[in-house]
């Protein structure tokens, strides 16, 4: 299975994987409104051996098969000074 990866121009470190190149029709309108425009960055073969930097390839394949897209959001980093330990 192939995935076509697009980077959001509005949200840093946010990517959309599509099952079909340039086919954003399955992406919910609310997601498109918040993240578009997108820039194409990568065409990747999602083989069982494939390792992705921020996502599990099997999870991405499953989402592409069910929904036609996978949304990769940035990981949140919490600094020790921002934590409430009470």
From Swiss-Prot:
Q: Which Gene3D superfamilies match?
A: YcgL domain (3.10.510.20)
Which InterPro entries did the record assign? YcgL-like_sf, YcgL_dom
Please report the stretch or stretches of sequence annotated as the YcgL domain: 1-83
Q: Which domain of life is it from?
A: Bacteria
- Return the PROSITE patterns for the record: YCGL
Quote the PANTHER family the UniProt record gives: PROTEIN YCGL
Q: What's the name of the protein?
A: YcgL domain-containing protein XAC4085
Originating species: Xanthomonas axonopodis pv. citri (strain 306)
* Upper lineage: Bacteria, Pseudomonadati, Pseudomonadota, Gammaproteobacteria, Lysobacterales
